[in-house]
Amino acid sequence: ISITFFLLLLNKVNSAEILSFSFPKFVSNQEDLLLQGDALVSSEGELQLTTVENGVPVWNSTGRALYYAPVHIWDNSTGRVASFATSFSFVVKAPVASKSADGIAFFLAPLNNQIHGAGGGLYGLFNSSSYSSSYQIVAVEFDTHTNAWDPNTRHIGIDVNSVKSTKTVTWGWENGEVANVLITYQAATEMLTVSLTYPSNQTSYILSAAVDLKSILPEWVRVGFTATTGLTTQYVETNDVLSWSFTSTLETSDCGAEDNNVHLASYAFI
């Protein structure tokens, strides 16, 4: 694993606060992940977000995994907002494809955020389907089950303080196949873009929406994944993340001409 967090202070250019990490696979007792609920790292090196017993997924399971280091997503002193990119691979597999539930999501949330609600279609992120600015959550959901607040198909959605997605695209979920995802956020345009590709058949899905992170999130957040299974015994699936990388870049302030060195921030992780 490669993990870095540093400040670059260069002559006549903006300084940048950068957080970057990469998990090509996961290991047991992964110290740099905060596991919540049913999440664990399997013996195969996969981040298993929901419970599997004797090879069978369990209903009413909720699990989350967050990176332990906070992400400085915007700076109150300058008003600047970070850009970020994250890529990951995951597999969702249901014993019965027509009864998949409920899905997996990547999210940004306050540092002290814990599992909310009853799981199921609320993803452990929300207490109800109603909007509330108090959540301070932005998420990208990969939804395998249609709930009352959803479009009438499996979909990828961008969620802002509500499980009711602000924008969606139909998702042709492939049962048991590896999906590769890239999510980017460009601070200059406030554009959040999601792309998902299945290498097995080269199908791709793209979704974009304007999201003002500064008006939604606190200055410091954690990033991670959450997943749930259904609230009845027949609606189940596995929700496994195979790999994950993330980089955020926050421009901080202009440097003086006399400073042309590169300085490390207060801590670094190797």
From Swiss-Prot:
Belongs to the leguminous lectin family. The keyword Ribonucleoprotein does not apply. One of its GO terms (molecular function) is metal ion binding. Keywords: Calcium, Glycoprotein, Lectin, Manganese, Metal-binding, Signal. Mn(2+) binds at residues 141, 143, 150, 155. SUPFAM superfamilies: Concanavalin A-like lectins/glucanases (SSF49899). The keyword Aminoacyl-tRNA synthetase does not apply. This is Bark lectin. Disulfide bonds: none annotated. GalNAc-specific lectin. PROSITE patterns: LECTIN_LEGUME_ALPHA, LECTIN_LEGUME_BETA. It comes from Styphnolobium japonicum (Japanese pagoda tree). Glycans are attached at residues 60, 76, 127, 201. It comes from the Eukaryota. The lineage of its organism: Eukaryota, Viridiplantae, Streptophyta, Embryophyta, Tracheophyta. Pfam families: Lectin_legB (PF00139). PANTHER family: CONCANAVALIN A-LIKE LECTIN FAMILY PROTEIN, LECTIN. Ca(2+) binds at residues 143, 145, 147, 150. Residues 1-15 form the signal peptide.
